[in-house]
Amino acid sequence: MAVTKLVLVRHGESQWNNENRFTGWYDVDLSEKGRTEAKAAGKLLKDEGFTFDFAYTSVLKRAIHTLWSILDELDQAWLPTEKTWKLNERHYGALQGLDKSETAAKYGDEQVKLWRRGFAITPPALDKSDERFPGHDPRYAKLTDAELPTTESLALTIDRVIPYWEEVIKPRIASGERVIIAAHGNSLRALVKYLDNLNEEEILELNIPTGVPLVYEFDENFKPIKHYYLGNADEIAAKAAAVANQGKAK
């Protein structure tokens, strides 16, 4: 039986992950720790013998720079890459830039958990006059008004990620190419929910750690056989738990 593999990587820790802020579409870079995580992800993939034919990432530098570090470790800096806003992090609306713990202290841990992890719940929306609205950013100049978010739930994130997966990424993998996707916590949660057919309660508890390669294996019918993280299991579990705890009051 032929096994097809796909590698997903959430970007390394960003400056705002480090500061415990809601980031969304705000274009912050990797922290020093994040750069180290990205290089380590590349080394893990190299040690396991992975090479790739094509890469996908978002239009946000924390994901792009993570991919660059990984490909540099693999000596594949030349790899053809497609950048798309459809793999961006979920847009956190008016929460973008706010401290997660302070927001939890104000609104309660449960409300912030729902904003962060609820399936169809959107954070408070931005006004289109707000400088954080993506309509003011030239990288989104070709998007329609309907495509420009003022806030997003995970359900809305799925609405842009999954068609891109089905129409663009999946056919490339099905043709035999080896693909890596470097993206974000929620765009990857959207894809994992779809691939693993998770329900709304299951996805609420799913946390993807930064900078750890997640490998999916598919059968000839493109059904997931299994998935697994590369690296030390205890360290990965601790990183996932840290992600879960970000939205709690101190």
Swiss-Prot record:
Family: Belongs to the phosphoglycerate mutase family. BPG-dependent PGAM subfamily.
Name recorded for this polypeptide: 2,3-bisphosphoglycerate-dependent phosphoglycerate mutase
Record's keyword annotation contains Magnesium: no
Entry keywords, A to Z: Gluconeogenesis, Glycolysis, Isomerase
SUPFAM superfamilies: Phosphoglycerate mutase-like (SSF53254)
Subunit structure: Homodimer.
Pfam family, one: His_Phos_1
GO biological process: gluconeogenesis; glycolytic process
Sites marked Transition state stabilizer: 184
Pathway: Carbohydrate degradation; glycolysis; pyruvate from D-glyceraldehyde 3-phosphate: step 3/5
Domain of life: Bacteria
Reaction(s) this enzyme catalyzes, per UniProt: (2R)-2-phosphoglycerate = (2R)-3-phosphoglycerate
GO molecular function (one): phosphoglycerate mutase activity
Cross-referenced PANTHER family: PHOSPHOGLYCERATE MUTASE
Nucleotide-binding in keyword set: no
InterPro entries per the UniProt record, alphabetical: His_Pase_superF_clade-1, His_PPase_superfam, PG/BPGM_mutase_AS, Phosphogly_mut1
Binding residue positions for substrate: 10-17, 23-24, 62, 89-92, 100, 116-117, 185-186
Its EC number(s): 5.4.2.11
Purpose of the protein: Catalyzes the interconversion of 2-phosphoglycerate and 3-phosphoglycerate.
Record-annotated active site: 11, 89
